Every structure is written in C-alpha cells, then in structure tokens.
From Swiss-Prot:
It comes from Oryza sativa subsp. japonica. The gene is BOP1. GO terms for cellular component: nucleoplasm; PeBoW complex; preribosome, large subunit precursor. The keyword Nucleus applies. Residues 1-73 are annotated as: Disordered. This is Ribosome biogenesis protein BOP1 homolog. Keywords: Nucleus, Repeat, Ribosome biogenesis, rRNA processing, WD repeat. Belongs to the WD repeat BOP1/ERB1 family.
Length: 678
C-alpha cells in the first residue's frame, strides 16, 4: 500500500519529530536564536488521525532573507574586492571594516561575552551564540550527542522470541555441497599445480641479506643502533679537591724540604701534582699557580678527546663461583685422624697397603721396613735392610704377599710373611732363584739387571747399573717396573717375576723419566718425564699420546681406576687433572699447596683422590668421573688434613688410600704414619 501526502505528513508530526519537545524563538535579551523547551509535546497530537500534519517553526531564521546576494559562488572571488555582492537595486554591498588587533583586545577586556561572538564570513557579520548553543558545541567537541535527552545506547529489544513457538525461523537441512569437495576448486588447484611445475608461475626468491660486519668497530657504534644519529654524551666532571689540599693540614702531612727535593728526581708522571702547605687563615692562601694550565688542559680534553659510553655490567661475584654440591652429600671421606703408627726413628718416605686392606707396609730412612696391622696399629714385622728405603710397593695380587722395596740403589723383593699357609708357600716359590740370572740385551756387554738371591731375608735382590727411584706393580701382580732417572736407554725397565726376566722397552726417551705406571685394565704404559706424560701401547710398541702438563717439574703420577683420567703432581705445588678423551692439556689445574707435592693417589672404589705435600698438609678431593662422555668430571675440594710436623723443611712424604674403605694413610717426616677416617 502507498502512503498519501497526508499520511506522509502524519509520520513527520510534532509527536515523532526529535524537535517536538522544543521550538525555535527569538531571544530578545541575547539578540540571537535559542532553543527553548515548550513542554507541550503530549498535546501536539491531532485528534483526527487522518488530518494532515503541518510543520510549523517559530524560528526567525526562516523569515530573514540572506543578506548576501552573491549566490553560491566561492568567497575567494571577492577576497581582494571592497564589496561583497550586490543589492536588489544593483548597488555594491560594501564590506564592513574589520577592527584591528588593538580594538579586538580592548573589546575582549571590556565585554565579558565577547568570546561567544563568531564572525559570519558569508553574511559579513558577527553572530553571538547563546549559552544553550555553547553547551551543544561543547558536547559535540566531546563526542557526545547534541541534546541530553537523546540516549545513544538504548536497551536492546529482542523482537523475536523462540520460546513458546512451534517452529524455528529456519529448519532447512544442510545442503549436500557442504559435505562434498568442490569440483571447481579442484580444477583451479590442478591448474595452479600444472603452472608451477611448468614454470609459468614463479615465486619471488627471498632477498639475501648481506652478512657483513664491522671488522674493527663495535656493534654499539653502528648507525642502526643509534637513535637519531650521534647522541650527546656529557663531559666528565672534574675531580673535587680532597683533604690533601687543605690550607691548614696536620704537621705529619706537610713534606719536609728533603722530600720536596726528592720529588725533582722523580718522573713527571710520578711526581705529586700538589704539595701541601700550611696557612694561618683562608684569606692568606695565594692563587693557584696551575689553575690556568689545568683549565687549558681540560679545554683540550673536552675539545679533542672523543667520548664513548661504556656499559657497566653489574655481576654478582657469587654467581661466578661454580655451583658445587654440599660436602655432606659427598660423604664418606677422610676427615679426622683415627690412628697413629709410631716406631720409625727417621722420616717415613713411602707407604703401601696390602690388597685386602688388612696390612700396611712402611719404609723409612732409618733403614727399616715395617708391616703394621691396620685395625690395631700393631707392628708385626720389621726388616733392617741397612739402607734408606726410598720406595715400597705391595704386590696387588691377594695371594702374593711380596714387598718390592727400593733400598739405596737397588730393588729388594721380600716375603711379607702374612696370610695363610697356601699363600705363604706360593710366595716362597716365586722368590726362589736357582742361579744368577743375567739378562743381556742385543749389543750390550753389561747386563741391565742382575737377579741375585738375598740369603739374609730369603728374597731376591735386583741389582741395577744405576740408582733406582721408583717401583710400580702391574695390576695382575706378575710384572713390575722400575725407573732409573739417569739410566739413558735403560731408564725404564720391565721385570717379570715368574720368569725372573728383565728388559728395557724404550731405546730413547724424550726426557729424564720421573715415574712410570701401568694402566689399571689395559696394555698401556704411562711414563712421566719432567714436563710431559707419554702414553705407550705395550702390545703395538708405539706412542699413543703425549700429555702436556705445563708445570715446572712433575713429581708423581696416578691413574684413575677407569683408565681415562690421570692426575699429576708437581714440585711447584700444582696438581693437574688430565682427561685423555678430552684433550692432551690439563682439564683442571689446582694450586693448593705452597710447597712441593710429594705424591698423588686415586681411590680404587670411591670417587676420591688426594695429594700430599711438604707443607705438612694433605688435601682430599671428590673426583667423580661420569660414564657419559658429554659430561665433564666433577672436582670438589673436601678436606685439608693436618697433624704432621715439619722436619728439616719436609712435611708429608707419601699418601695412600685404603683399597676398600674411605681411609687415607699419610707418611710424614716426623717418623709417624697417620690414618685418617670419616
């Protein structure tokens, strides 16, 4: 159905119009237009519904004709003219004179309502807005609706109510096209794939960024990292005067004339810049002689010296320390002295523990070898060999109770006379020798070693051509090695107890040998010279590795039961840990002792190792070696063992671990053997 004119007019009646609540009227007081509330919105309805509504307006704006008659043309056309349009008679309408800044300032000062006047450029007149219009403008500037009675966010009214209805708005079933792949999309994909394969569609390759950098510059100085180019760096402030520049210093701070004369003999950079003097009062202080010079030097520094910002990193010193486990979690380890073995009259130079840990043997410079019972500390056997015992080693086999002792220049094999009868019989059988065994090498006139029966002690004496320093057993107990430091090609010798045979495997060594030890499980042989450790393969007769210690002189060496780690002690108090799988250089270097390290040793069962020194101390460390090759060994210092006294400048001469318990034996120059337990 269509609407008639009357119906259309009724839709725009005063009841439906947003302006029905008010009317436009002339404001006599203000001389302008204002919007007033009529309060007759409810009575504006027509009693006759079919009567056409007539729009009426009380505004005088519709009655006043526009004063400008130029029409709808740009005002720029009359910008430089004296008139603006023409009147009905054709005369020019002159522009009103604009007031200057002084007149406008005076009018603002005199008229309090002048801020509400607006210049109408189209009609060339000033219009004063009312308070209501000012409020409307203020609301528009704030982004609000012009009138307060308009609600911009009315309550939402849901016109559709599903409750109580029998049918929904739409209950059509889902179309089949939503479940079936699109055939047209498949064709488009096939076309795109074919075009990509044939090269019709080419993708843009990613741009390669230049991988250049400043070779001699700092990354912080690049233009990319700077904000708005060069940043201002304030100049450093000059140093403030200190107490030394006091005009009335204490007498002890005033230098004498001799000290002042001695300053002239010093270099200029070392010479003090200010000499304190004493004055009665502050007004007696003369002008500073170097004020002009120092001011000029500072100006040169500010003008010529470049300034850079140095980033200071505040690092907590505690965070730099390695995180080590607590000592309580690493127990047991030797901490306190449990027992003392006394009986020697001279410094105890060497120790050796029996394979089961029941007996311990000690050798002293008083010419005696003693065997002690570990649990009771009772001495059960004493041999007076008549010479200084430099080294002693117990056979590692449990059924071979044989002691190898370096006495003066030669090596003595003794029956320890401990154990059951079967072990005694086997030990005596190994120490039997029928005739003189002289082993001669090819081309040598003199034998390297003579195996001689020692009738007094019912043992064997191995007579070397030069003095022997150390002796070490193979882990099976049949082979042992001796080191003759000044023996040239015969410096390192290998001996076989069962065959009474000796030979020297090395024709030439790169340095003077200090010690030699066997690998605990493989056919490897370690020879320590003054600065290097050579690792040889006895089966292939070739050099495998050469470990560089970096110390002044090696004094002792020990092999980890796993065979892949080596510790070396030096005469400058350093202990080096080598991880042979990692590098030929030390993994860790520990500087704990103030004097020479006399011996280093590993524990066979526990992750412990120790070092003894002539400073009368023995250090115990936790050394855990992991089966994972990606994890480095863990080294933790545990305890410093003290108790030995110094004799002739010497302290602890040897240290050995118990084979089964976390106990440590130490031999001191004070003729005492100490046992440290947990």
């Amino acid at each position: 159905m269509g609407h008639s004119d009357g119906d259309h007019g009724s839709d725009l009646s005063a009841d439906d119009s947003p302006w029905s609540e008010g009317s436009w009227s002339d404001d006599d007081d203000e001389g302008s237009l204002s919007f007033e509330d009529s309060g007759e919105g409810s009575d504006a309805e027509s009693d006759e519904p079919d009567a056409p509504a007539v729009e009426e307006s009380d505004s005088s704006e519709d009655e006043v004709a526009p004063r400008n008659t130029i029409g709808d043309v740009p005002l720029e056309w009359y910008k430089n003219e004296e008139h603006i349009g023409y009147d009905i008679t054709g005369s020019k309408i002159k522009k009103r004179d604009r007031e200057g800044r002084i007149e406008a300032y005076l009018r603002n000062a005199d008229d309090a309502k002048n801020w509400r006047k607006i210049y109408d450029e189209y009609n060339d007149e000033e219009v004063q807005i009312t308070k209501e219009e000012a409020k409307i403008i203020s609301r528009l500037l704030k982004g609000k609706t012009p009138h307060t009675n308009v609600d911009p966010y009315p309550d939402y009214v849901d016109w559709f109510e599903y409750d109580g209805k029998g049918h929904p708005l739409s209950s059509a079933p889902e179309p089949k096209r939503r479940f079936v792949p699109s055939r047209w999309e498949q064709k488009k994909v096939v076309k795109l794939v074919r075009a990509i394969r044939k090269g019709w569609i080419k993708f843009d390759k990613p741009k390669e960024e230049p991988n250049f950098y400043l070779l001699w510059g700092d990354e912080t100085d690049t233009a990319d990292n700077k904000r708005q180019g060069l940043s201002y760096i304030p100049a450093p402030k000059p140093n403030l005067p200190g107490h030394e520049e006091s005009y009335n210093p204490s007498v002890e701070y005033i230098p004498t004339q001799e000290e002042i004369d001695s300053y002239q003999l010093m270099y200029e950079e070392d010479r003090p810049k200010f000499i304190p003097r004493k004055f009665d009062c502050l007004r007696s202080v003369p002008a500073y002689e170097k004020a002009l010079r120092e001011g000029f030097d500072r100006c040169l520094d500010l003008y010529l010296c470049p300034r850079t910002r140095k980033k200071r990193i505040n690092i907590d010193p505690e965070s730099l320390k390695p995180k080590l486990p607590s000592k309580k979690d690493l127990r047991p380890y030797p901490r306190t002295c449990y027992l003392e073995f006394k009986g020697h009259n001279g410094p105890v130079k060497s120790l050796s523990v029996e394979a089961t840990g029941q007996w311990i043997a000690s050798g002293s410079s008083d010419g005696t070898i003693r065997v002690w019972e570990v649990e009771t500390g009772r001495c059960i056997k004493v041999w007076n060999v008549g010479g200084v015992v430099h080294r002693i080693a117990w056979n590692p086999s449990p059924d071979r109770h044989i002691l190898a002792a370096v006495v003066d220049h030669d090596l003595l094999l003794l029956n320890a006379e401990v154990g059951d009868e079967d072990a005694q019989m086997k030990t005596k059988g190994l120490l039997q020798i029928e005739e003189l065994a002289q082993e001669e090498d090819n081309g040598d006139k003199k034998p390297a070693v003579k195996w001689v029966k020692h009738e007094k002690f019912d043992g064997i004496m191995l007579i070397h051509h030069k003095a022997v320093s150390t002796v070490e057993w193979h882990f099976k107990g049949d082979y042992f090695t001796t080191v003759v430091p000044s023996g040239d090609s015969r410096a390192v010798l290998l001996h076989q107890l069962s065959k009474k045979h000796s030979h020297h495997p090395f024709r030439k060594l790169p340095g003077l040998p200090i010690a030699a030890v066997f690998h605990p499980s493989q056919k490897m042989f370690f020879v320590a010279t003054k600065k290097f450790v050579q690792v040889y393969d006895l089966q292939k007769a070739q050099l495998v590795k050469k470990l560089e210690s970096g110390v002044r002189e090696i004094s002792s060496i020990s092999i980890h039961p796993g065979g892949d780690n080596v510790i070396v002690g030096s005469k400058d108090g350093k202990l080096c840990w080598f991880d042979t799988d990692l590098s030929t250089r030390p993994y860790k270097t520990l500087k704990n002792h103030s004097k020479d390290i006399t011996n280093v040793t590993f524990h066979r069962k526990y992750p412990l190792f120790a070092s003894s020194s002539e400073d009368c101390t023995a250090y115990v460390f936790h050394g855990m070696v992991y089966s994972d090759l990606n994890q480095n060994p863990l080294i933790v210092p545990l305890e410093i063992l003290r108790g030995h006294s110094s004799s002739d400048g010497r302290g602890v001469l040897d240290c050995k671990f118990h084979p089964r318990q976390p106990w440590l034996f130490t031999a001191g120059a004070d003729s005492v053997v100490r046992l440290y337990c947990d």
